[in-house]
């Protein structure tokens, strides 16, 4: 029987199969952070249980951490308690932890791939929605709730239904100044925020094949915003080259054995997909969200759509509500809209390639007087690499604040947030009401679009930046 990549990984991890299309799956890697794990550990203690596989469990601090100080007191009282609990829990249960003083600390979905913890064919879970990021390596990865965190800690397994298969084949030639972030935003807009519900999405096609691993991670990171359980990309030579000599990757004879296994991790020819979507992106433009959901997105050269263009009443009502919250009107070009803050970072766009791309836009420029801008490297390793390349100096010279690693302004859970009514060009992954702070207005864009907005104090078409049209 021909199998998809998803079915191959799912089937190879079945511990016990039930008749209702649900199985108990073995989990290869369990990632933890300070927010969704404390209750799970408390429950283990209440039931006198141990962590079954501490060496297959890894923790870091990212959601609540201060990006201006490594002092645990700088993050606020609640964050301090959560971080102290994580330190205590990891010590008691013998789990590796990158705390805020560790030079490699950072966002969990940045650390795991860059250290070679994430490997093709794995099952990976974390108490965080954007665990789908790891699917870029051909790993079946998804977010779980706190009760499931407890279950995996105790058993190294998880009960999981079998999802349907969707293939999104992306072809064409991606244009200059159009990025992986623009591509995934476009796909979300095309399919809608529930278009992937009930599916695991495999991304493929010549565009994906040409992407770096960091670009692929951006794609899979936001698969959840289509409503999918996760996203997958089959591993290839790009994957293997990225992983070679990483800290936790196999070495020597084990590397050769791993390669032999990984090279077979792809969907069989003529494998059945429940849904197939073909997208040609040769004419794709830089994208920007205008509403309060990632699927409310347009090209930078388009107007906010008329409510009558939506095909059902629910979408019309959501669009009206979004425009009201965002302080926008239909028919408006976002290039006429000023910004208050710019955020470059997150598990979507906080890697070294993202910082390099943004720094090229900012070199020898200054940000607008009306803008406060911060750049937050996704990990200590990313921060050091950027500093070794002199990127920090470019950002600082332009007027950005160069911060410590963390989730930062992606979510209003730490001290980096928007004030009521402030508008932000953000490289993060969600733009819900209040996501970056109560009353804050979030526009999702690529790192280069965010950098350009910082320079001009408003949204601009980055393609025109070097043509003298945004003066």
Swiss-Prot record:
PROSITE patterns: ACONITASE_1 (PS00450), ACONITASE_2 (PS01244)
Stated name of the protein: 3-isopropylmalate dehydratase large subunit
Metabolic or biological pathway, per its Swiss-Prot or TrEMBL entry: Amino-acid biosynthesis; L-leucine biosynthesis; L-leucine from 3-methyl-2-oxobutanoate: step 2/4
Record's catalysed reaction(s): (2R,3S)-3-isopropylmalate = (2S)-2-isopropylmalate
Family annotation (HAMAP family): LeuC_type1
Gene3D superfamilies: Aconitase, domain 3
One Pfam family, short name: Aconitase
GO molecular function: 3-isopropylmalate dehydratase activity; 4 iron, 4 sulfur cluster binding; metal ion binding
Record-listed E.C. numbers: 4.2.1.33
Record key words, sorted: 4Fe-4S, Amino-acid biosynthesis, Branched-chain amino acid biosynthesis, Iron, Iron-sulfur, Leucine biosynthesis, Lyase, Metal-binding, Plasmid
Assembly and binders: Heterodimer of LeuC and LeuD.
Top-level EC class as recorded in UniProt: lyase
Role noted for this protein: Catalyzes the isomerization between 2-isopropylmalate and 3-isopropylmalate, via the formation of 2-isopropylmaleate.
Cofactor mode of binding and number, as noted: Binds 1 [4Fe-4S] cluster per subunit.
Family of the protein in this entry: Belongs to the aconitase/IPM isomerase family. LeuC type 1 subfamily.
Gene Ontology BP annotations: L-leucine biosynthetic process
Binding, [4Fe-4S] cluster: 347, 407, 410
Cofactor(s) needed for function: [4Fe-4S] cluster
């Amino acid at each position: 029987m021909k199998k998809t990549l998803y079915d191959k990984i799912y089937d190879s991890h079945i511990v016990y199969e039930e008749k209702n299309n649900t199985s108990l799956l073995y989990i290869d890697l369990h990632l933890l952070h300070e927010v969704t794990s404390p209750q799970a550990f408390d429950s283990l203690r209440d039931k006198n249980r141990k962590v079954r596989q501490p060496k297959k469990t890894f923790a870091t601090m990212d959601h609540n951490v201060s990006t201006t100080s490594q002092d645990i007191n700088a993050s606020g009282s609640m964050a301090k308690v959560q971080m102290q609990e994580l330190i205590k829990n990891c010590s008691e249960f013998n789990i590796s932890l990158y705390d805020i003083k560790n030079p490699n600390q950072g966002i969990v979905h940045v650390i795991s791939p860059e250290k070679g913890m994430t490997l093709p064919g794995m099952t990976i879970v974390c108490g965080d929605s954007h665990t789908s990021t790891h699917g870029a390596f051909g790993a079946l990865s998804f977010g779980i709730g706190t009760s499931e965190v407890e279950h995996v800690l105790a058993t190294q397994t998880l009960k999981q239904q079998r999802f349907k298969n969707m293939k999104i084949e992306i072809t064409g030639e991606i244009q200059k100044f159009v990025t992986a972030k623009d591509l995934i935003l476009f796909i979300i807009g095309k399919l809608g925020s529930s278009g992937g519900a009930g599916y695991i999405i495999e991304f493929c096609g010549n565009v994906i094949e040409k992407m770096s691993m960091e670009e692929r991670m951006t794609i899979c990171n936001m698969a959840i915003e289509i409503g999918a359980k996760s996203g997958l990309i089959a591993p290839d030579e790009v994957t293997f080259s990225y992983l070679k000599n990483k800290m936790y990757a196999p070495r020597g004879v084990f590397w050769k054995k791993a390669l032999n296994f990984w090279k077979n991790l792809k969907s069989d020819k003529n494998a059945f997909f429940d849904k197939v979507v073909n997208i040609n992106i040769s004419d794709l433009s830089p994208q920007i969200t205008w509403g309060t959901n990632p699927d409310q997105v347009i090209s930078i050269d388009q107007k906010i759509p008329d409510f009558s263009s939506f095909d059902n009443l629910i979408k019309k009502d959501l669009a009206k509500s979004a425009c009201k919250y965002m302080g926008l009107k239909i028919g408006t070009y976002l290039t006429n809209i000023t910004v208050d803050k710019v955020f470059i970072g997150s598990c979507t766009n906080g890697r070294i390639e993202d910082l390099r791309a943004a720094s090229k836009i900012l070199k020898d420029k200054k940000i607008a007087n009306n803008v406060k801008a911060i750049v937050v490297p996704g990990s200590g390793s990313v921060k050091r690499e950027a500093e070794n390349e002199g990127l920090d100096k470019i950002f600082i010279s332009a007027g950005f604040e160069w911060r410590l690693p963390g989730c930062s302004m992606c979510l209003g859970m730490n001290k980096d947030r928007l004030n009521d009514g402030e508008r932000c060009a953000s490289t993060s992954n969600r733009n819900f009401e209040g996501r970056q702070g109560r009353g804050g207005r979030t526009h999702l864009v690529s790192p280069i679009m965010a950098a350009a907005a910082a320079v001009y104090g408003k949204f601009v078409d980055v393609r025109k930046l070097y043509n003298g049209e945004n003066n």
